Amino acid sequence: MNRKQHFRPHVQGESLENKINQLGDEVFEALLPSMVTFAASVFIWMIYLGFLPVSLLSAVFMTILLVVFSVRAFAKIRKLNRQIKNHRKGLDGERYVGTKLERLSSNSTFVFHDVVCGKFNIDHVIISTKGIFTIDTKNRALPDRDYNKADFIFKDGELIDSTGVLQSDLMHKIESQGRWLEGKINEWTKKRYPVYRVGIMIGAYVNNINKDFSKYWIINDGAFAGFFDKEREKFPLNDVLRIADSLQRFIEKPIA
């Protein structure tokens, strides 16, 4: 597992942090036309008021242009700010869970963060003699509910929130992550290893109706470590080292 110094793995939430920075750039780009038009409008009005000859029509035109650009910029920035807020909440969740997962690291348990897989990324991956896990974290604002009522109900591979809405997109994402890693491991080792699909719902009460954790672990942030500790040893250490090294080679990237 020793790697060259000019390579580094992703850190917790790196993809989300990059998205936040990109959205910040888009906010500036949205403001730029308004700022330029504002400066031009002030300049033209100063001219119209007596410094240099200019028509009233030009001043009015620039003012209208400023209003149009400002309204468009306001609408776009409002949307971007919502996205930034959601990404920051997700980033906080990823880092919070990632810090807890790091405590599980050992000579037989390897924790990876922000594994980029083309169109999507996996928040965390654990490669261990106790099993292989893809982990997706959700840090959502939870609606008010009765004390004994679950925030999420998991049954027969389906996840339903407390308002009765089926979380099919989330389950599809969790399934896709596990299937992707299973395929990659098979590609690297020419063997098939089962992967647990984990969804960590931060601060939520999740009711697993069937008590079936053979494939999916839809649990809250306080439960994962306990579930993991109770798992029996499944894979030889040499297999784990080989898979972990292959994954590290896949996710590492050069430092510019």
What is each of the regions a protein language model found here?
Residues M1-F120, S128, I132, A141-D146, ...:
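Surface-exposed interaction regions that form or flank ligand-binding interfaces
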Residues D123:
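Phosphate-centric recognition/catalysis
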Residues K138:
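Activation of the activation-loop gatekeeper triad in protein kinase-fold domains
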